[in-house]
């Protein structure tokens, strides 16, 4: 039905499209706006980034309505995503704080619409995928350099980011936060988890294309960004980075295990040995890693446990439709459940947050979307003989999985800087795996 409507509008606007310089170059404008979303995400506020993303959406709608032969299609995993979005709308309608939930809904709409725009753009522009990954990699590298310099200038904490009670002075880490707004090392860590796979993916792409200088440059930037990730002190990003390395080792085994087994095992062993040595020798890093297992002995862990407990109580009382999306809406209702002194903007777990905000069935839909996408991507990676396509699919899949694992213990998943990278990776996976 939608494609029939599009065909009708395209027919009516055919003369306009053929004689409009703007419409003839609309793909170039969409590409420029997508790039601008990534570039501005490093220094601009959430509102500015969202506004630029909406420009991308507007241009895409104009393109779909006017460009001949443009069609819409919905793949299996997108049915889950569509169900999730519809349930978010139902949750919005039933929210007791509608005006606050509406703000959160507009953010969700922007992310979903940006994903739709990327899918439509990449249908006929698959050759632009390296440029999208390059833009993300460039931004990640910029943040890595900034964070590295902040470490040597010993920037002060803007708020209490680390429990220093019981730590010796040499065990206190200077936590870097880059230029992402609002300034927060956990946000920077999450951004690295989402974006660093693009650098490793580009390095592999250039290696497959026999552009060895670019491949070496990609590897160096990826390693440098990985180093800066550990300087954020974000323990969730440490776990996410472990997922990234496990994913890369698993995919590379497809090409190296049979003929280069010794080299493969040496690389894996070297990475594990280097990471272990760094944890043992660098006292501040060791203290951060060990604090993961300190349970309630660490104030940050204890805070999260209290938030989880209160969020589960919120879910029990609002399990069907949730309370409505948005951190402002969450904070208002969370106040009725929270333990004194433990205020929070979110549930510190993306799956628990979705359940609290939009209900049980929205959570099922979102998890169904992830499982279907991951399943299709893994099948493609195992069976495809196209090395470059496997690299792109693996890059997207590793980023998606790492972000979701990090999101089990943190709240930064819902920040626009990470959201736009996440949905870009989903669009790339969709384009490579499904199309």
What are these regions (language model features)?
Residues 1-103, 120-134, 203-216, 259-266, ...:
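Transmembrane signal-anchor hairpin modules in multi-pass inner-membrane enzymes, especially those
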Residues 170-178, 262, 278-309, 333:
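Flexible juxtamembrane loops connecting transmembrane helices in multi-pass membrane enzymes
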Residues 250-253, 358-402:
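Hydrophobic transmembrane alpha-helices and their immediate junctions
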Residues 34-35, 167-182, 305-306, 339-353:
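Juxtamembrane membrane-water interface segments that cap and precede transmembrane helices
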Residues 55-61, 242-246, 394-435:
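Transmembrane alpha-helices of multi-pass inner-membrane enzymes
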Residues 43-52, 103-104, 179-195, 236-237, ...:
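Membrane-interface micro-motifs in multi-pass membrane enzymes
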Residues 295-309, 313, 317, 321-358:
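Long extracytoplasmic/lumenal interhelical loops at the membrane interface
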Residues 32-38, 56-59, 89-90, 113, ...:
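Alpha-helical transmembrane segments of multi-pass inner-membrane proteins
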């Amino acid at each position: 039905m939608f494609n029939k409507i599009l065909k009708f509008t395209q027919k009516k606007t055919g003369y306009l499209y053929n004689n409009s310089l703007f419409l003839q170059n609309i793909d170039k404008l969409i590409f420029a706006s997508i790039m601008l979303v990534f570039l501005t995400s490093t220094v601009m506020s959430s509102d500015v980034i969202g506004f630029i993303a909406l420009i991308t959406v507007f241009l895409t709608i104009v393109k779909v309505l006017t460009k001949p032969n443009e069609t819409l299609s919905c793949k299996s995993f997108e049915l889950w995503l569509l169900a999730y979005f519809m349930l978010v709308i139902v949750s919005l309608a039933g929210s007791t704080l509608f005006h606050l939930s509406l703000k959160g809904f507009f953010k969700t709409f922007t992310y979903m619409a940006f994903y739709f725009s990327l899918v439509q753009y990449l249908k006929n522009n698959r050759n632009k995928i390296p440029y999208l990954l390059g833009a993300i990699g460039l931004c990640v590298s910029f943040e890595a350099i900034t964070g590295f310099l902040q470490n040597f200038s010993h920037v002060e904490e803007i708020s209490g980011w680390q429990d220093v009670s019981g730590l010796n002075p040499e065990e206190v880490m200077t936590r870097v936060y880059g230029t992402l707004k609002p300034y927060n090392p956990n946000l920077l860590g999450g951004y690295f988890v989402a974006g660093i796979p693009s650098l490793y993916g580009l390095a592999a792409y250039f290696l497959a294309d026999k552009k060895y200088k670019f491949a070496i440059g990609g590897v160096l930037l990826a390693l440098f960004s990985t180093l800066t990730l550990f300087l954020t002190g974000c323990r969730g990003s440490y776990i996410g980075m472990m997922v990234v390395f496990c994913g890369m080792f698993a995919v590379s085994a497809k090409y190296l295990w049979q003929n280069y087994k010794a080299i493969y095992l040496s690389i894996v062993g070297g990475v594990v040995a280097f990471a272990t040595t760094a944890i043992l020798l660098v006292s501040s890093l060791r203290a951060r890693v060990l604090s993961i297992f300190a349970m309630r002995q660490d104030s940050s862990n204890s805070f999260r446990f209290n938030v989880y407990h209160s969020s589960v109580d919120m879910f029990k009382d609002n399990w069907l439709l949730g309370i409505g999306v948005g951190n402002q809406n969450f904070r208002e209702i969370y106040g009725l459940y929270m333990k004194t002194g433990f205020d929070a903007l979110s549930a510190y777990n993306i799956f628990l947050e979705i359940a609290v905000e939009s209900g049980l069935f929205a959570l099922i839909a979102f998890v169904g979307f992830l499982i279907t996408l991951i399943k299709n991507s893994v099948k493609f990676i195992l069976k495809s003989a196209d090395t470059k396509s496997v690299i792109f699919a693996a890059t997207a899949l590793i980023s998606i999985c790492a972000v979701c694992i990090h999101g089990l213990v943190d709240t930064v998943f819902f920040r626009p800087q990470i959201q736009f990278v996440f949905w870009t990776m989903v669009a790339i996976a969709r384009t490579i795996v499904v199309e």
